Amino acid sequence: MAKMIFVNLPVGDLVRSTAFYQAVGGEKNPQFSDDTASCMVFSDTIHVMLMTHDKYRQFTSKKIADAKNTSQVLLSLSVDSRGAVDETVDKAQAAGGAPDPSPVDEYDFMYGRSFEDPDGHLWGVMWLDMAAAQSATAQAS
């Protein structure tokens, strides 16, 4: 069985956040969603659990960070093409996110942009041509 990742994010408005993550490609799994959490599926191995602050507090005694003012993690998803990078960031902006809070990464073998969700969580979207990346690495050494 492939290893899976479940990213748990506290959100201020579950309905708004669920709609946002659906707009950028997540599919809500009703089996693991209720009025306190939405399980957003991005692939067989990548899930984002959106939780109300009350629900999130059940898992930690630590204070919930204000992601609009504090950054602890930058999450990144890979996509299949350069165009899909731009498309995903455009969808994030149309759904209420902020495009490109981080500099755009552009190389012959890689292209990456970022967005901030309505709660301030930072996401990177990247495309990588693995063969070209390996070639560039080999030439550099």
Language-model segment annotations:
Residues 1-19, 30, 72-77, 126-141:
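N-terminal beta-strand motif that seeds the catalytic metal site of vicinal oxygen chelate
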